[in-house]
C-alpha cells in the first residue's frame, strides 16, 4: 500500500543519460506493483524545492532496457498510482534538420508513430477507448516548459514533429531521408510512443523535453552510441536546471480549463 508521504503530483521520466536528476533535496526509493508487471526501475520520490516529485528512469539504471522492451504501461500506471498529474518526459533525439543543432532542446507538438510491436493501450477489452491524438501533448505544460527554457537562455525550438521508430537500431540512410523529406519530421527517437498516448489514456498532462544529441544519417555524419552519450552528458546540466525551474512553477493540479488532458476519456470510451 502506498503511504501519503509516497505521493507526488509531478513525475519525471528520464531518458538516455538522465538516470538520476540529482536535484532532490530529500528522497526515498519505492517499489510500485502494477497489473502490467514491473516498471523500469524503483521510483525515486521526494522533494525538489517545495514540490513532491516522482522520478523514473525509462531504461532503468545503467540503461539496461532497450526502447522496444520498455514496459510503458507499467511505467505510466505506476506514476498514476502515486498521484502524478504532470508528466515531464526527457529524451535524447536525433535531428532531421540542420538548424536543430546538437545541444538544442525541442518541445515537440506532434508525433509520427513508426513503431511496430508495442503495447499501445490500457483498454484492450472488454472496455475500449479511442482517445484523440490531434494535439498529443499538454499545451499548458508545453508553454510553461518553453517559457522556462527561454528564461534560462537554453536554446529551445518551440515546436517540432517527433518521429518514433521501433529501434534499437538507428536508421538507414534511405529511411532517414524518408523521415526528413517525405514525412517532414524534425526529430527522431525511439521512446515517445506509446508513452505519450498511455499518459493521455491515464488523463495526465504530458510533455516532452527532447534534447538533440546527433544528426540523423541523412547528414552523412555517422551516428554512434558513444557520440549520443557524449553530447547527452553535456546536456544533462541544462536539463537539471530546466527541470528544477519548471517544477517550481507547476501547481498541484492543472487549472480548470487550462487544458483538456484530465477529460481525455470523456468522449473516448466505447
From Swiss-Prot:
For this protein, the Enzyme Commission number is 2.4.2.28
The keyword Glycosyltransferase is assigned to this record: yes
Disulfide bonds listed in the record: 138-205, 200-262, 259-261
Q: Which residues of this UniProt protein bind phosphate?
A: 16, 58-59, 91-92, 191
Task: Read off the SUPFAM superfamilies from this record.
Answer: Purine and uridine phosphorylases
**Which key words are in the record?**
Disulfide bond, Glycosyltransferase, Purine salvage, Transferase
| GO MF term set | S-methyl-5-thioadenosine phosphorylase activity
Pathway field of the UniProt record reads: Amino-acid biosynthesis; L-methionine biosynthesis via salvage pathway; S-methyl-5-thio-alpha-D-ribose 1-phosphate from S-methyl-5'-thioadenosine (phosphorylase route): step 1/1
Binding sites annotated in the UniProt record for substrate = 190, 214-216
Q: Is RNA-binding tagged as a keyword? A: no
The UniProt note on temperature reads:
Optimum temperature is 120 degrees Celsius. Highly thermostable.
Q: Where is this site: Important for substrate specificity?
A: 171, 225
Per the record, the GO terms for biological process are: L-methionine salvage from methylthioadenosine; purine ribonucleoside salvage
The UniProt-reported impact of residue 259 to S is: Reduces thermostability of the enzyme
Q: Which residues cross the membrane?
A: none
Identify the GO cellular component terms for this protein. cytosol
- Catalytic activity line of the entry: S-methyl-5'-thioadenosine + phosphate = 5-(methylsulfanyl)-alpha-D-ribose 1-phosphate + adenine
Q: Name one Pfam family in it.
A: PNP_UDP_1
The protein's matches in PROSITE patterns, at most eight in alphabetical order, are given as: PNP_MTAP_2
Quaternary data: Homohexamer. Dimer of a homotrimer.
Instruction: Indicate the family of this protein.
Output: Belongs to the PNP/MTAP phosphorylase family. MTAP subfamily.
Q: What does this protein do?
A: Catalyzes the reversible phosphorylation of S-methyl-5'-thioadenosine (MTA) to adenine and 5-methylthioribose-1-phosphate. Involved in the breakdown of MTA, a major by-product of polyamine biosynthesis. Responsible for the first step in the methionine salvage pathway after MTA has been generated from S-adenosylmethionine. Has broad substrate specificity with 6-aminopurine nucleosides as preferred substrates.
| Name recorded for this polypeptide | S-methyl-5'-thioadenosine phosphorylase
Source organism per UniProt: Saccharolobus solfataricus (strain ATCC 35092 / DSM 1617 / JCM 11322 / P2) (Sulfolobus solfataricus)
Q: Which gene encodes it?
A: mtnP
Amino acid at each position: 500500500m502506498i503511504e501519503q508521504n509516497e505521493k507526488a503530483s509531478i513525475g519525471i521520466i528520464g531518458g538516455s543519460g538522465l538516470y538520476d536528476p540529482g536535484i532532490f533535496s530529500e528522497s526515498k526509493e519505492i517499489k510500485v506493483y502494477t497489473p502490467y508487471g514491473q516498471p523500469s526501475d524503483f521510483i525515486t520520490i521526494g522533494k525538489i524545492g517545495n514540490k513532491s516529485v516522482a522520478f523514473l528512469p525509462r531504461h532503468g539504471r545503467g540503461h539496461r532496457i532497450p526502447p522496444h522492451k520498455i514496459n510503458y504501461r507499467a511505467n505510466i500506471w505506476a506514476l498514476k498510482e502515486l498521484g502524478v498529474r504532470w508528466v515531464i518526459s526527457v529524451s535524447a533525439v536525433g535531428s532531421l534538420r540542420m538548424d536543430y543543432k546538437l545541444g538544442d532542446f525541442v518541445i515537440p507538438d506532434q508525433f509520427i508513430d513508426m513503431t511496430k510491436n508495442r503495447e499501445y493501450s490500457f483498454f484492450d477489452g472488454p472496455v475500449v477507448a479511442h482517445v484523440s491524438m490531434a494535439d498529443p501533448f499538454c499545451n499548458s505544460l508545453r508553454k510553461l516548459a518553453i517559457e522556462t527554457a527561454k528564461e534560462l537562455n537554453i536554446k529551445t525550438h518551440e515546436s517540432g514533429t517527433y518521429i518514433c521508430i521501433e529501434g534499437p537500431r538507428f536508421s538507414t540512410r534511405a529511411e532517414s531521408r524518408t523521415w526528413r523529406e517525405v514525412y517532414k519530421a524534425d526529430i527522431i527517437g525511439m521512446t515517445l510512443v506509446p508513452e505519450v498516448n498511455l499518459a493521455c489514456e491515464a488523463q495526465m498532462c504530458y510533455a516532452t523535453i527532447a534534447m538533440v544529441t546527433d544528426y540523423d544519417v541523412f547528414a552523412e555524419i555517422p551516428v554512434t552510441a558513444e557520440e549520443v552519450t557524449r553530447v547527452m552528458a553535456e546536456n544533462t546540466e541544462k536539463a537539471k536546471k530546466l527541470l528544477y525551474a519548471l517544477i517550481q512553477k507547476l501547481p498541484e493540479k492543472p487549472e480548470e480549463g487550462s487544458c483538456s488532458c484530465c477529460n481525455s476519456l470523456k468522449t473516448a470510451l466505447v
